[in-house]
A protein has these predicted regions:
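Residues in well-ordered beta-strands of folded domains
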Residues: 36, 115, 122-124, 151-155, ...
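Flexible glycine/proline-rich, aromatic-decorated loop/lid segments
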Residues: 3-38
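Glycine-rich, flexible loop/turn motifs
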Residues: 21, 31-33, 38, 63, ...
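Long, contiguous, secondary-structure-rich segments that constitute the structural scaffold
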Residues: 41, 45, 50-94, 168-181, ...
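Short, well-ordered loop/turn elements at secondary-structure boundaries
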Residues: 7-9, 109, 117, 146-148, ...
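Long, low-complexity segments enriched in small/aliphatic residues
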Residues: 74-170
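Short, glycine-/Ser/Thr-/acidic-enriched flexible segments
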Residues: 1-3, 18-20, 41-42, 47, ...
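Structural motif
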Residues: 11, 34, 149-151, 179, ...
């Protein structure tokens, strides 16, 4: 199941799938915090290894193996659990262990502390203001796209995980490619019918995708599922199916947090 990144690689170190490996201990926070552990269920089908073992063996080859003092995944997990009061055997019944039977609520009078200069919720952040950022900005109206241009909106569905499952035989049969949702009236203006191949382009990339004409989308926007448009030819089922939204996304980001702004790209749509 080649990814596009693996397709470009000179050397591939294949990791076992989630059913074929034991993972590190993970923690879930909340009112009833707990730790959970995914254990190997079946033997690997091919010459693959656990991710932590791949890292250890690379480290040994470059002389830093002393930073990875374990010989297998069980040893690593037991080391993680040292001092917690839990053992690997405690996970066998349910796959997780809770820190206690009761929910842990915050002490609302004395225990609710905020890491702000005032110790309170700051709608106008003094930390951001002191760093030169306007922390309580005024509303700026957004210019509506026109002339065959639309705001690109992307999202996911419950059938696929990121870009890693589109070549899975069963999931590919259910959802093999993404479509471009476009408003019925806007599609009519552009001469686009449901199922027509359309050309979509942005200032940084382009592609061809099938149109899904619907009333269930805003006239100023178009929508596509994330995770398609694979370029790896050995991923034969997902290769060249649909369009990757990453090809179209312009480099716009949140200047304070640094996160990408996924819905700030304007695209042009026309009959292919």
């Amino acid at each position: 199941n080649y990814s596009d990144i693996a397709w470009y690689a000179d050397v591939i170190l294949p990791e076992s799938t989630y059913l074929e490996r034991t993972d590190c201990v993970q923690q879930a926070n909340g009112l009833k915090p707990q730790m959970f552990l995914r254990r190997q269920a079946v033997e690997p089908r091919y010459d693959t290894r656990d991710g932590a073992m791949i890292l250890k063996q690379i480290a040994e080859r470059i002389g830093t193996g002393n930073f990875f003092p374990y010989e297998n995944m069980d040893e690593l997990v037991r080391w993680q659990l040292e001092g917690t009061g839990f053992s690997m055997e405690d996970f066998e019944a349910k796959g997780f262990v809770a820190y206690g039977k009761k929910q842990i609520f915050m002490d609302r009078r004395d225990g609710l502390k905020f890491k702000t200069p005032s110790g309170k919720i700051e709608f106008k952040s003094s930390l951001l203001e002191d760093a030169g950022f306007e922390s309580f900005p005024v509303y700026e109206p957004v210019t509506a796209p026109s002339g065959g241009k639309f705001r690109l909106v992307v999202g996911r569905n419950a059938l696929h995980t990121h870009v890693s499952t589109q070549n899975n035989p069963y999931l590919n049969e259910i959802c093999s490619e993404n479509e471009l949702w476009i408003n019925t009236e806007k599609a009519a203006d552009l001469g686009i019918n449901n199922g027509d191949p359309v050309a979509i382009s942005s200032p940084v990339g382009s592609g061809e995708i099938k149109a899904k004409v619907t009333d269930l989308i805003h006239p100023e926007a178009v929508f596509m599922l994330h995770g398609f448009g694979h370029e790896a030819k050995k991923a034969s089922r997902s290769y060249n199916k649909g369009v990757s939204d990453s090809v179209l996304q312009t480099n716009v980001y949140d200047k304070i947090g640094g996160s990408p702004a996924y819905h700030e790209t304007v695209v042009t749509v026309k009959i292919a």
